[in-house]
UniProtKB/Swiss-Prot annotation:
Cofactor(s) essential for the protein: Mg(2+)
Enzyme Commission (EC) number: 6.1.1.20
Cellular localisation: Cytoplasm
GO cellular component: cytoplasm
Subunit comment: Tetramer of two alpha and two beta subunits.
Underlying gene: pheS
Name assigned to this protein: Phenylalanine--tRNA ligase alpha subunit
Source organism: Prochlorococcus marinus (strain MIT 9312)
Length: 345
């Protein structure tokens, strides 16, 4: 590193006000020249100390001001402070210049070939439940159904009463349903979407209603208080159980492939007759769907002539279909966000 010229002041050099002013002027000129010629941050730091430090030239002048008269001290003090502020500004500007010069040199030395392919960010993938639900929707859309949705916070009327679920039905029990107040609740199925749709759209109707539903189930390997459901509704003239059976079998064969399927008689308040659908899984029968012919009372409450129009409804849980498809034995794995599990799909 090159030597930096210095300008020092001693007490013996001070004889009069004019001498001090001359020394300050010379100091300012010499310091400016040294700052402009400083080529490194280290040189700048040494200049800062020699000029503005406790033992620097300006500090020496300020210390000997006591030897001057009361009238002279303000003159010297004002000039010294002006020079101090000016030198601080020069030092900071030169520091910024050195930083910019270093950055320019770095940019010149570190050229980037923009034609080189980047490493890229690993792409994400759909959650297995989303993929399963999308596949279910695609199958029914291929059968001529359209997708409808509705609110997750429902009224007692749409969730229960309009679906022929009586006041004393166990599903209305607070142990099974999340009530927000006396008349509002978190929907326990997506069937209310069907009612809302039929209120505004006369038959014929072919819709599916996917979405989240809520039930007060204890969390275990096969139950969750929040899960995904897809409801199916078909209303048309001369619809009978064979249409229901054919639709369900077509859907299950398309989704699972050649797998044993059976229908069992069951009961649901909003369908009559009703059935549950089982498939073979790990050597046992596993329920995967509930279905049935729409109860005429449900249609009549909506002002639909049940003598002219008939239909069927079916419902399924997306989680269960995904578990059967991928041989997953615990529903909780879907909600832990464990990448070791999710990256398998």
């Amino acid at each position: 590193m090159k030597a930096i010229p210095t300008f020092t002041i001693s007490v013996r050099q001070i004889e009069s006000l004019s001498q001090i002013e001359e020394k300050l002027n010379n100091l300012s000129l010499t310091a400016k020249n040294n700052i402009d010629n400083a080529s490194t941050h280290e040189e700048l730091d040494k200049l800062r100390v020699s000029l503005l430090g406790k033992k620097g030239d300006l500090s020496i002048i300020l210390k000997i001001m006591g030897q001057l008269s009361a009238a002279e001290r303000p003159i010297v003090g004002q000039k010294a402070n002006f020079i101090k502020i000016n030198l601080q500004d020069l030092l900071n500007k030169r520091k910024n210049q050195l930083n910019n010069e270093a950055l320019d040199q770095q940019i010149k030395n570190e050229k980037i070939d923009v034609t080189i392919p980047s490493i890229g960010t690993p792409p994400g993938s759909k959650h297995p439940l989303i993929s399963t639900q999308d596949e279910i929707i695609d199958i029914f859309c291929g059968l001529g159904y359209t997708v409808e949705s509705g609110p997750e916070i429902e009224s007692d009327f749409y969730n229960f009463e309009s679906l022929n679920i009586p006041k004393n039905h166990p599903a209305r029990d607070m142990q099974d349903t999340f009530y927000l107040d006396e008349n509002r609740l978190l929907r326990t199925h997506t069937s209310p979407v069907q009612i809302r749709y039929l209120e505004k759209n006369p038959p014929p109707v072919r819709i599916i209603a996917p979405g989240r539903v809520y039930r007060r189930d204890a969390v275990d390997a096969t139950h969750s208080p929040v899960f995904n459901q897809v409801e199916v509704l078909c209303i048309d003239q001369d619809i009978n159980f064979s249409h229901l059976r054919g639709t369900v079998l077509t859907f299950l064969k398309t989704f699972f492939g050649d797998i044993p399927v059976r229908f069992r008689a069951s009961y649901f308040p909003f369908t009559e007759p009703s059935a549950e659908v089982d498939v073979q899984w790990k050597g046992k029968w596993l329920e995967v769907m509930g279905c049935g012919m729409v109860d005429p009372k449900v249609l009549e409450k909506l002002g639909i002539d049940s003598e002219k129009w008939t239909g069927f409804a079916a419902g399924l849980g997306v989680e269960r279909f995904c578990m059967v498809r991928h041989q997953i034995d615990d529903i909780r794995k879907f909600y832990t966000n464990d990448l070791r599990f999710l990256e398998q799909f």
